[in-house]
């Protein structure tokens, strides 16, 4: 393509609203246009990049037997009500809903488990059809409370989502492994640094779940990594430092503690380390339109993990209760909540099991108790892992080596769903005995916009975007001083030659000076620049400069050979098997 034909616009100045580098550069280089908060127009330049990434996705998924389809974006409410996710998503305000002229409710799809399950249930004729792998690349919607960071957290976004249906847990795991490897192949071809970590399934499902993260200081997710093992902090199982507690029980004491509310206050007041204090927090659990308040006990030196609590207690959502809610449901101020005489359900983190002679509140203002013990003073609660992992905690999966903490941008997520959706939608087959059995389902997704933004966050430099070669909008830009007839004629000849070999060059034919064109090419992120300037006019040699400032001097007769060595192979869209 020629620049004079390309509908695009670059800008010298950054958008003041662009709070992150990827958002700034995508707007500055003419890849996106903000239509409204969290809603963007994908420009022709952006779509060239997106199509190349989609082509890579299609190649890898078709290679493992994936079949592409297009599912509806508008979903009847009853499908989501059948799985309970209508209430779960609406309770967090994430679901866009509409009504038609017959007053029937629909939602704009944030995900497609329900509708693909209904489809397969109607078409599946027998076990011999299994496993099935269906995928689509489509627009999805989430009414984000705080849309921000450009494509990182938008209200409307582009995703690839895959769904597999199998006849057994073993076959489901085989499909999971195939999709996992296909996703690895996709990100390997993008040549970016990423990690795969264990994750919480959230509202999608409770089975095996992993996330793909591009490492970035922008990352909204915190990752715990130990050797080759990693986990999202929401799901990380960790062994915190262990401490020795008294063997003999001391008499329990009630102590006046006027206005002593925090762990730090208690440490100073009782002259004890924080791990000898039982901290109790109140969480609000949402179950559809219903709410429940529960108390969680944890060592005073640690923090609770709301995701683990919500998962353990099968809640749709979990958050810390407000001061007003605590006062209403417990009749006591924040800071004096404890397991003694607790008027609501009480659970405790498993690291508190060995605590003896600990200090805790008793749900009375300005009072605490010391030398409190399980069984004698408080019935033992149900224990579970409610711990938020920290750097230095030991990783039980990696021979108890310590965790390091990194930040990452989640770009893909894979799940084993089991039979949660297939049972509800009667996605069944007949086994050897002729009995109906529910299929075992998996779901997988890649955020295309998030991945492209994450590439920019990781690879960009002070001159602009640095796209991976495999997805750059053009393979090479051809640049010369506007008005230089000799260079213009040579550029036109090279441009046609490259097109003839199937490459995607961008010929900058604007009547602008060479320096201006060089800056635009770097900003846009084209991997190579072919520069026709003084060197070419004096010696006939072609100057080529990579985006990383690697320079080449090539004779015109060797240029095609150079292209075959350095440019991506001429691309065609992947054939459908």
UniProtKB/Swiss-Prot annotation:
Where's it mainly located?
cytoplasm
What are the transmembrane regions? none
| Sorted UniProt keywords | Aminoacyl-tRNA synthetase, ATP-binding, Cytoplasm, Ligase, Nucleotide-binding, Protein biosynthesis
Against CDD domains, the record matches this protein to:
ProRS-INS, ProRS_anticodon_short, ProRS_core_prok
- Entry's Gene Ontology BP terms: prolyl-tRNA aminoacylation
What does its UniProt record remark on the domains?
A: Consists of three domains: the N-terminal catalytic domain, the editing domain and the C-terminal anticodon-binding domain.
Subunit composition and interactions: Homodimer.
Write the protein's name. Answer: Proline--tRNA ligase
Organism of origin: Chlamydia abortus (strain DSM 27085 / S26/3) (Chlamydophila abortus)
Task: Give me the gene this protein comes from.
Answer: proS
């Amino acid at each position: 393509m020629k620049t004079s034909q390309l509908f695009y616009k670059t800008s010298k100045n950054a958008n003041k609203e662009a709070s992150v580098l990827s958002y700034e550069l995508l707007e500055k280089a003419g890849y996106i246009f903000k239509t409204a908060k969290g809603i963007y127009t994908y420009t022709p330049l952006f779509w060239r990049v997106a199509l190349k990434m989609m082509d890579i996705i299609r190649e890898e998924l078709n290679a493992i037997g994936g079949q592409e389809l297009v599912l509806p974006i508008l979903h009847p409410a009853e499908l989501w009500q059948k799985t309970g996710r209508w209430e779960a998503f609406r309770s967090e305000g994430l679901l866009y809903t509409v009504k038609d002229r017959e007053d029937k409710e629909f939602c704009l799809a944030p995900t497609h488990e329900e509708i693909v399950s209904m489809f397969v249930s109607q078409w599946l004729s027998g076990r011999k059809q299994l496993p099935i792998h269906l995928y689509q690349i489509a627009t999805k919607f989430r009414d984000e409370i705080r849309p921000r960071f450009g494509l990182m957290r938008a209200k409307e976004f582009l995703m690839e989502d895959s769904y597999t249906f199998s006849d057994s847990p073993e076959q489901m795991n085989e499909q999971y492994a195939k999709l996992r490897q296909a996703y690895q192949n996709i990100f390997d071809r993008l040549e970016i640094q990423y990690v795969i970590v264990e994750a919480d399934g959230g509202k999608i499902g409770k089975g095996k779940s992993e996330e793909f993260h591009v490492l970035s200081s922008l990352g909204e997710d915190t990752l715990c990594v130990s050797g080759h093992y990693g986990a999202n902090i929401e799901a990380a199982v960790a062994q915190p430092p262990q401490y020795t507690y008294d063997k003999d029980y001391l008499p329990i004491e009630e102590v006046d503690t006027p206005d002593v509310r925090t762990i730090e206050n208690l440490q100073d007041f009782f002259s004890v380390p924080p791990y000898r204090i039982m901290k109790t927090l109140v969480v609000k659990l949402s179950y559809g339109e219903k709410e429940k308040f529960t108390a969680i006990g944890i060592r005073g030196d640690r923090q609770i993990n709301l995701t683990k609590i919500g998962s353990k207690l099968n809640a749709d959502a979990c958050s810390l209760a407000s001061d007003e809610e605590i006062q209403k449901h417990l009749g006591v101020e924040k800071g004096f909540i404890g397991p003694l005489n607790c008027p609501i359900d009480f659970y405790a983190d498993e690291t508190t099991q060995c605590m003896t002679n600990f200090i805790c509140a008793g749900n009375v203002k300005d009072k605490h108790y010391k030398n409190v013990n399980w069984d004698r003073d408080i019935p033992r609660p149900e224990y579970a892992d409610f711990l938020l992992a920290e750097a230095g905690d030991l990783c039980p999966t990696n021979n108890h080596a310590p965790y390091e903490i990194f930040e990452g941008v989640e770009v893909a997520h894979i799940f084993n769903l089991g039979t949660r959706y297939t049972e509800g939608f009667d996605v069944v087959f007949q086994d050897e005995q002729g009995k109906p059995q529910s299929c075992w389902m998996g779901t997988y997704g890649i955020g295309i916009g998030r991945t492209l933004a994450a590439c920019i966050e990781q690879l960009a430099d002070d001159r602009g975007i640095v796209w991976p070669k495999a997805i750059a909008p053009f393979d090479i830009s051809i640049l010369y001083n506007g008005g230089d007839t000799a260079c213009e004629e040579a550029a036109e000849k090279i441009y046609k030659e490259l097109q003839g070999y199937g490459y995607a060059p961008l010929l900058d034919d604007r009547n602008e000076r060479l320096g201006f064109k060089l800056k635009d090419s770097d900003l846009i992120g084209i991997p190579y620049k072919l520069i026709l300037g003084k060197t070419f006019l004096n010696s006939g040699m072609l100057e080529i400069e990579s985006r990383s400032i690697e320079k080449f001097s090539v004779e015109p007769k060797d240029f095609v050979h150079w292209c075959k060595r350095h440019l991506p192979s001429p691309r065609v869209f992947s054939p459908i098997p």
